[in-house]
Structure formats: C-alpha cells, structure tokens
Regions:
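Bacterial N-terminal signal peptides that target proteins for export
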Residues: 1-8
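A small-residue-enriched
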Residues: 20-36, 66-132, 230, 236-251, ...
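Regulatory alphaC helix of protein kinase catalytic domains
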Residues: 40-67
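Coil residues (strongly favoring Ser/Thr
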Residues: 45, 59, 88, 112, ...
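Sec/SRP-type N-terminal targeting helices
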Residues: 76-77, 93-94, 131-159, 209, ...
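Periplasmic alpha-helical coiled-coil/stalk elements that build and connect Gram-negative outer-membrane
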Residues: 146, 153-274, 385, 412, ...
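Short segments within alpha-helical structural elements
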Residues: 191, 220-248, 302, 397-456
Length: 462
C-alpha cells in the first residue's frame, strides 16, 4: 500500500509532462544541392567578410559606408531595440520569481458608546510566488530570448541594407558623372563641328541644312547636361540622408571626381556556397526564424494558462495597539498559505486563446518558408544578372570601339568631300548612345555584384 502514493506521484508527473507538450508543426524547406544559375561561380563556402564592400577596392566607397554605419539613424534605432529586448528579458524572468513587498499601516477606531479610541499599528512584509510548474517560465524565457535574437538579426538586416544602399548610390553617382563627362565632351566636339560647318557654309562648301543639322547635334548633347547635373545632385542628397548628415554638411565633405567605374572594372570572384547557406546567413530569414520561435513560446504560454497554478504566500511582521511595542516579541505575527487554482469554465476563452496562438504560429511558419524561397530567388536573380551582363559588356566594349572608328573615318571622308553629312550625324549619334549604354552597363554590373552580396547575407556577424 505504501507504493500507491509513489505511483500516483509518477502518474501525476507524467500527466504534467504530457499536458505541457504543445506538438507544433516543423518547417518544410525544399533544399536544392546547387544554384540553378551558379555554374560559372565557385561553390566553396561563402567567405564574404564583415566589410564585404571593400572587395571593390574603392577608398571613397569604404569611407562612405563606414560613415553611414557610424551615423545612420536607422542603425541607431535598431541597436536600441536590441537593448530594449534585453531589458524585456529581465522583466519577463522577474514575473516568475518571488515578489516581496512591505506594508505599514496605522488605524484608529472610535467607539461612540465608550468614547474610546482604539489604535493599531502594523508592519507586515509579504512574499508571494506563483510556481511555474507547467513550463510557463521556460516558455516566457524562450520567447524573450527569441525576441532578442530577432532584434539582433533585424539590426543585421538594417545594416546590410544600408551598406548596399550606400554602395548602390555611390556607383550610380559615378555613372551619372561619367554620363555628364561624356555629354560635355561630346558637346565640345560638336561645338567645334558647328564652328567648322559654319566656316564651310560661309565659303559655300556646306549647305544651310548641314549647319542646322550640326547645331541640332550640339543642342541634343547640351540638353542632356542639366539632366545629369540634376541626377548627380539628387544622388548626393540621397547619400547625405544615408550618411545621417545634413545636405550642407555632406556637400562639404566632398566625393572625389573619379572615372574608376570603367577604367578599373573587372569581374569579381565570389564564392556562393550552397543554397542552404542562406538559412543561417540571411538576416531576413533568421529574423523570420526567431519570429517563429517567439510564436512557439506564445503557444506554450497559452497552454500553460489552461493548467493548474500553485501560489505560495508568506507574511510576517508586527501588529500591536501601541507604537512602542511594534518591535517587541509579543507583537510578532506570521502567516503562510498555499493555493491551487485550476481554470474550470470560462466559455472557451483559454482554449480559443491557445488555438489562436497556434494559428499565428502557422502563419509565421509559412512566412519563414516563404522567406527562404525569396532568398533563393534573390540569389538566382543576381547570378543571372551578373552572367548576362558579363557577355553584354564584352559586346558593348567592342561596339563602342567600332563606333568610335566609324565616327573618325566618316568625319575624315566628309571633310574630303567623299561622304554626306548625314553619315557623320549617324556615326556621332551611334557613338554617343553606345558610350552612354556602356557606362550604364558597367555601373549596373557593380550593382549586380552588390545585390549578390546582399542576397548571400553580406558580412554576417557584425
């Protein structure tokens, strides 16, 4: 018969463990061995460092990104949210630890029959503790820790996005400056052409149509100059915002004039690893994962709310009718109590609360799976863009050189009276257009590499 209480104890513990098991679905991620469009890339482990943008070898870009990281307000907000989550963890834990309070009271009662005033003085410290028997503390702590990790990865995401935006804006700025330089150079050459045609016209060697055509070419190039000047100013203002600077402060810093965007361009070698790497590298995927962990903890708390709770309370102090006797031994009192509370009927509120928490968990599970698919798509898109742009750049480099030779030879033929001026116009337009397109392709290829680094998760662990 003595074994019966022991057996009942084992059964009770087993039921407690079973009742706390929340049985949640696991993510189903479709893994692939390699990227579909990554055949021309190294499949070694990803080795992008924390300062991944340094691979471009541009000191101005390095300085801009470092300044943005140090001053950008969104970075500061994200860092503050990490600290907020850390404080919330302490608050969460404290809710499941004993609480101690103290009370001091003075009472007076007047008896009208005897006309006496009875006084009482009390000092009663109290302690109470709701025992987390069914995992409520564990689930609450798990949820709070997941919130910290979520904010850490959110910080990583904000930082990576900032780094990529600064790099993209910088190469866009270089592109506009190159376009402006081409427009100015073309305008100068066309102005010289107008001077020549005007001279030939005055001596009867060129028609008025030729002169008007030469002027139209000049006006076309000159019309592009203010457009690129405007684009440069707008890009600089965008960079100022990313830097956390006022426009005036940022403009005083200055960004060196550079044509390195074409002169120093070369294909960059980036190891892309395997698709599963994005699961632990991408900030958005990891943030979605920890959101899922928070949801799981919320389900656990909702389940715990449906189970019995045990509260222990203790109070001890002094109660007396005379203030000078407050600290005498005769006035000391103590009380200890334990209570067990089991929710019985609340119109299904607790059960529906758990079911609602489970639905939120499923929503976040699907969001996590979707974030993985989107990460794969981002990498594949960047790989396609880089691969196709490589071939396009090679063709356009040859095309620009061909149009340059055509323009030189056509102009020489025209001066010798062996070609019509329309041929000169066509050659000039083709050269101008091909130069612009080539500069844009080079800038876009830099941005493609930026997008690939961002898609792979950038420099994890900052």
């Amino acid at each position: 018969m003595r074994r019966i209480p022991y057996i009942l104890y084992i059964v009770a513990v087993a039921m407690m463990v079973v009742s706390c098991n929340i049985h949640l679905a696991k993510p189903r991620l479709l893994m692939q061995e390699e990227y579909l469009f990554g055949k021309d890339f190294s499949h070694d482990s990803i080795v992008l460092g924390g300062d991944w943008w340094r691979m471009f070898g541009d000191t101005t870009l390095n300085r801009l990104v470092e300044r943005a990281i140090a001053q950008n307000k969104n970075i500061e907000i994200a860092a503050s949210r990490i600290e907020e989550a850390r404080h919330s963890l302490i608050v969460t834990r404290s809710q499941y630890l004993p609480s101690i309070s103290g009370a001091i009271s003075v009472e007076e009662k007047y008896d009208s029959a005897t006309r006496n005033i009875a006084q009482s003085y009390k000092i009663l410290p109290q302690a109470s503790w709701e025992l987390p028997l069914f995992g409520s503390l564990r689930y609450a702590t798990k949820g709070a820790k997941a919130a910290i990790n979520y904010q850490k990865w959110q910080y990583q995401g904000v930082r990576l996005a900032l780094e990529a935006e600064v790099a993209t804006a910088y190469f866009t700025l270089l592109q506009y400056r190159q376009d402006l330089a081409i427009s100015r150079r073309s305008s100068q050459l066309r102005r010289e052409m107008v001077t020549l045609i005007d001279s030939l016209y005055n001596y009867g060697y060129a028609s008025g149509v030729n002169l008007d055509q030469a002027r139209s070419l000049l006006y076309t190039a000159e019309a592009d100059i203010p457009l690129y000047e405007k684009a440069i100013a707008q890009t600089l203002l965008s960079l100022a915002t990313l830097m956390g600077d006022t426009p005036e402060t940022f403009m005083n810093i200055g960004i060196e004039e550079s044509n390195a965007i074409t002169n120093s361009y070369h294909p960059f070698e980036i190891a892309i690893g395997v698709p599963s790497d994005v699961l632990h590298r991408r900030p958005d995927v990891m943030a979605a994962y920890y959101t899922l962990q928070q949801s799981a903890a919320t389900v656990g708390l909702a389940r715990s709310a449906r189970l019995p709770s045990v509260t222990i309370s203790v109070s001890a102090g002094s109660a007396t009718g005379k203030i000078r006797q407050l600290f005498d031994s005769e006035g000391w009192v103590a009380d200890m109590a334990a209570s067990l509370m089991q929710p019985i009927f609340n119109f299904g509120g607790l059960r529906r609360g758990e079911l609602a928490a489970r639905e939120v968990y499923m929503q976040n599970l699907f969001a996590y799976e979707q974030s993985y698919l989107e990460a794969l798509s981002d990498v594949e898109s960047a790989l396609v863009a880089i691969t196709s742009s490589r071939e396009e750049l090679l063709r356009y480099a040859g095309l620009v050189e061909s149009y340059r030779n055509i323009a030189i030879k056509t102009y020489a033929l025209y001066r010798n009276g062996l070609s019509d001026y329309l041929d000169v116009i066509d050659a000039e337009r083709s050269l101008y257009s091909s130069q612009m397109q080539f500069e844009n392709l080079v800038a876009q290829q830099y941005i493609n590499y930026i997008n690939l680094c961002k898609a792979l998760g950038g420099g994890v662990g900052n």
